Amino acid sequence: MTLTLMTRFLAVSNQPQAPIFIKPVPENYFLADALQHGIQTKQLNESLSTQNIGLVEEESSVCSQPISKVGFMKTHKTASSTVQNILMRYGMNSDWNFVMYSAGSHLGPPSNQYTLNRPFSSSWLRDVPWHDMAQEQGYNILAFHTKWDQGEVERVLGDGAKYITILRDPVDEFESLYNYVHFEKTFQMDLEQFVSDYIGARRPIQRVNRYLGRNQQLWDLGMVQEDINNHQAVMMKIKQMDQDFDLVMIAEDFESSLVLLSDVLCWPLANMTSLKLNARKKSAIEKLSQKSQKILKDWLWADYKLYEYFKKELEHKKNISGLQRVRKDVVELKKLNDKVKDECVLEVVKNTKTLSSDFVPWSKDVLAFKIDESKDTCKYFGISENHFIEHLRELQMERLKKWRLNL
């Protein structure tokens, strides 16, 4: 569904303080307060001040109410952690019920949640402590790594949910996956040599840990290996995804994707702000030869069919939504992100030993943020994924205790 631009206000000031966005009455709210109290408005302030406010009104929107159920297919190495962080911050501030287990950060089989070799099943949630509460209240969001099954996710979220995912150029995605997960330890060679010795030589390649490897994006989206090797099955999957997903974002056009996500979810553009999470250090990125890139692209043909189709679809959605409007919102979103970085980030660090434990990422190969912890809202822009999920779990347990008291 395409939505026009919501009413927006811009303010100008010479005395920067904390980020704000504005609702009609009162006019001024710090962005931190607005997010904490779940203000649903797309009216936001271009400065960081609560003084000398000058307002400029733009066109209004037909957007009726914010979406409160979201199914996010978290693909591997596609900027999905940043999208997940955006969704989790919104869900946290809205007291949402998250689809999760009582421990861990994935949604694989309960016997081993981190091995994503079987499609998600709603039956896996029967033993979670908040099962009865969720049966009564419903779940609001599924946003963790899983092997997707549209029907089973719909069974959990119920009516009214919006479904989104994100894709990335398959060669770049595979290079990132290979080096982030350290496949070089598995195959005893770097990616350049792997392309030559394995792919070029047509040697059989098993999935690492039974779920990581070739055409990873289609695998994440629920396809089995036999079907991924079948051109007709791949095209049928793409067609089905086009029907199932309300928005397929593209990592290489990230800000435009978030502008459209703001439309799809009917959320303020201010809620699309983020820091770039899990970005690798330059030293951890392997530059491939053109020959190896070509071999990889041919080898990843199925993911390329998927990627190219939805890349065109994103352009189509941008045109329908209004290309000039999207571009304008992209500029605005970048300004908002700059403000978040200015207000919240004390330092971008390579050596995570200087960070408190909440902000240390899973991999030593990625950049991390030293966050100004004196500002409560800032924390959740830069907190590590696992620590954020644990905090959400604690909040969910608190809601469960209150729910039980009211029985």
Summary of predicted features, one role per range:
Residues 1-407:
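Membrane-interface amphipathic segments in extracytoplasmic regions
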